Regions:
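Active-site pocket-lining segments that scaffold enzyme catalytic pockets across diverse folds
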Residues: 147-148
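A short, surface-exposed beta-strand/turn
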Residues: 586-630
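Walker B catalytic acidic pair
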Residues: 222
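Acidic/polar low-complexity interaction segments
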Residues: 2-124, 128-132, 140-143, 163, ...
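Compositionally biased, intrinsically disordered low-complexity regions
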Residues: 41, 47, 72-75, 301, ...
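Zinc-dependent metallohydrolase catalytic domains
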Residues: 116, 123, 127-141, 152-188, ...
Length: 670
């Protein structure tokens, strides 16, 4: 019999009836995972060159969040006021249909709305890398102090609390100057724009306008300054030549390695250089358009592989083991750190790709002249991108393994090695060996380390006697219930408030123990680089004495990280410090009169504690408050800075502590 005919309505009803059990209703208001925004991979000038135009415009993939025009989101607030032009630019609405429908506004040097989109995309991408590597939410540097409510009920003597800063402010057109900088007092990024010099260089338009906010290198660099200052607010205190250099170098490292997240760009450059990273390519250069627009510049602002010589010719950088000892300018010294990390990256890349090169070269190890296979390019680029991602996360994760003040490059090497051992106990791919080789090649060595083995470079585990172990157990018992509560919090402001209250309570807890005058507590604190007694120092035959230094608890944060091999790492970070203040009489060079100034000398420790067993202390990373060696080194360095004949006294910040770094002055380009 022929099949029975049914009406369309009956058929629809039949379909609905039989599919009811398997039909899954979808929420059409489901929030997307990511927001896609177009932007530049390199400086805008590369979009006007045939060789790079196809790879310079990329799509930034950042976590979705609710934003209002600006953009204004959970972490950032873009405020586009141009004081020099007396203009206020309309804020971009990233949720408008026209913007969403085309993955963001079209990249444009002349559209302020795109400028706002660009800075938002790059800074959010940078934040995402930090939060993934550190295993916790980012909280910006505090702005000011105010009263804690109900301080008496909480049992706190210190009634002051640091103010929560919800958003980092970004000003794309803040100044008409060849500068861009992070302002720690405003907790803001200020980007400038300026007129390029009249000489013809690269893709620049002589006399044209250069916007620093359109350089992803500059934006990522400044964002990293803000993040690093939020994680380690003592790293702006200029106590050693490495401090300012570390801020500069680390910010460049993040900007440089983030480039390797753009696979098409990496493939393009490797195809151009026959798969070699030690030849000239744009992957190892930062802020090219910015650098070429300045008077007497000959290329990128900074390069990790090579640089232009006086004749304008590009030459490869070769490691010099004596350069570190003889370089004192923060930019040049920071460039050494960048070159060291990029050297480790190149070593890893060569090591990981040698099998591919052998196969492609029939065992000779030398590829034939001409273009290499597109398949080989893709394989090489995949290795380069994977190595860069791992190395970037190692560099970021190491920040949690640094001492709280007076950072030196040797400390950072130990932090890198220790952080990676925790993340990947077996170094199958040679990351730690490559880092050690690169630091050794440039003469950068830690203090008081006998060998450069990974075992020697790993921060030591604490050695407590029975009584000291009991004292730490007492401290851990105080922390445990509160840390468990902190770990359950999701909202950033609540994390900030609760962690600072806990920090204040821990500070009071330790102070009471110190006031008790117990020798056991002094012995225990000495293992943490702290003291319960007055501090005495001698420098240049002058003695300095101060009462028991002020104790501060800077951080108590749980961290939940994922290592290279998928290993889960759960830890609690506790950062303690003390400040010794020594008065001394100095002559005012302007008036010739004697004045009293205060020498600040800090010490302290980063405690890394197992989250699963809070009474298990994994590392004590300290700078001893009673170290005469460190005190003497700091005094010598800061006195040399005050000698204008050395040309180093350019980084004091005016109204703040005269030994604090000024990022505005640090980044000034005449």
């Amino acid at each position: 019999m022929p099949p029975k005919k049914t009406s369309k309505a009956a058929g629809a009803a039949s379909y609905s009836k039989h599919s009811k059990a398997t039909w899954i209703a979808r929420d059409h208001n489901e929030t997307p995972e990511y927001r896609l925004l177009r932007g530049y991979a390199l400086d805008p000038g590369f979009s006007t060159q045939l060789q790079t135009m196809s790879v310079n415009e990329v799509v930034y993939k950042i976590p979705w969040e609710d934003v209002t025009p600006g953009p204004v989101g959970e972490y950032l607030e873009v405020i586009d006021v141009d004081p020099a032009s007396n203009c206020f630019y309309e804020p971009v609405d990233l949720d408008s249909k026209l913007v969403l429908g085309q993955q963001g506004l079209t990249p444009s040097e002349g559209n302020p709305l795109f400028h706002q989109q660009m800075v938002y995309a790059v800074v959010m991408k940078t934040i995402r890398h930090f939060e993934f590597a550190l295993g916790r939410k980012l909280i910006w540097r505090h702005r000011e102090k105010h009263q804690i409510k109900n301080a008496d009920k909480l049992g706190l003597e210190n009634r002051l609390r640091l103010q929560f800063v919800r958003r980092l402010r970004i000003h794309p057109h803040a100044i008409r100057d060849s500068n861009a900088y992070y302002d720690p007092e405003k907790v803001a990024l200020l980007f400038g724009y300026f007129t390029a010099q009249d000489q013809v260089q690269g893709a620049n338009h002589p006399g044209g306008v250069v916007f620093t906010c359109l350089s992803p290198d500059v934006v990522a660099h400044e964002a990293t300054h803000a993040i690093l200052d939020s994680l380690h607010n003592r790293f702006i205190e200029d106590t050693d030549a490495d401090v300012g250099a570390f801020h500069e170098g680390f910010s460049d490292i993040v900007a440089l390695l983030q480039r390797f997240t753009f696979t098409e760009l990496v493939e393009h450059q490797l195809a151009t250089t026959q798969g070699r990273l030690d030849r000239y390519n744009v992957l190892g250069e930062l802020a090219t358009q910015f650098g070429m627009a300045l008077q007497d510049e000959r290329g990128a602002l900074r390069g990790a592989i090579g640089k232009a010589n006086r004749k304008g010719q590009w030459v490869k950088l070769e490691p010099d083991p004596n350069e570190y000892k003889n370089t004192f300018d923060p930019h040049d010294r920071g460039a050494l750190l960048v070159a060291t990390i990029f050297d480790a990256f190149q070593r890893l890349y060569d090591h990981r790709t040698q099998d591919l090169i052998r196969i492609a070269s029939n065992g000779t190890g030398e590829l034939p002249k001409g273009s290499i296979s597109p398949d080989l390019v893709k394989r090489l680029a995949a290795e380069a991108c994977a190595i860069a991602a791992h190395l970037l996360h190692i560099c970021i994760r190491a920040l949690d393994y640094c001492p709280p003040c007076d950072i030196r490059f040797g400390d950072y090497l130990q932090a890198l090695i220790t952080a990676d051992i925790d993340a990947a106990p077996v170094d199958e791919n040679g990351y730690r060996v490559a880092l050690i080789e690169a630091f050794r090649a440039r003469g950068i060595f830690p203090d008081r380390v006998n060998t450069l083995s990974t075992e020697s470079l790993r921060w030591s585990r604490p050695v407590f006697n029975d009584k000291e172990s009991d004292l730490f157990a007492e401290l851990a018992a105080f922390l445990k219930p509160e840390v468990l509560k902190l770990a359950q919090l999701e909202e950033r402001e609540e994390i900030f408030v609760k962690s600072h209250i806990l920090q204040a309570r821990l500070c009071e807890f330790i102070k009471k123990k110190i006031k008790g005058g117990s020798d056991e507590w002094d012995s225990f604190l000495s293992k943490l680089g702290l003291t319960a007694k007055p501090v005495k120092m001698t420098y240049d035959a002058v003695s300095y004495t101060t009462p028991v230094p002020l104790l501060e608890v800077h951080k108590i944060r749980p961290a939940f990280r994922i290592g290279r091999e998928g290993k889960q790492i759960s830890q609690v970070l506790v950062v303690l410090s003390q400040t010794a203040k020594f008065p001394r009489e100095v002559e005012n060079p302007a008036t010739g009169e004697m004045e009293t100034e205060t020498i600040k000398f800090r010490g302290g420790c980063t405690l890394i504690i197992s989250f699963g067993a809070i009474d298990q202390l994994e590392y004590v990373i300290c700078k001893n408050i009673r170290s005469e060696y460190r005190f003497g080194r700091q005094m010598e360095y800061q006195q040399n800075k005050e000698d204008s004949s050395l040309g180093l006294a350019t980084y004091a910040r005016g109204e703040s502590d005269k030994y604090d770094l000024s990022f505005k002055e640090l980044h000034f380009h005449s």
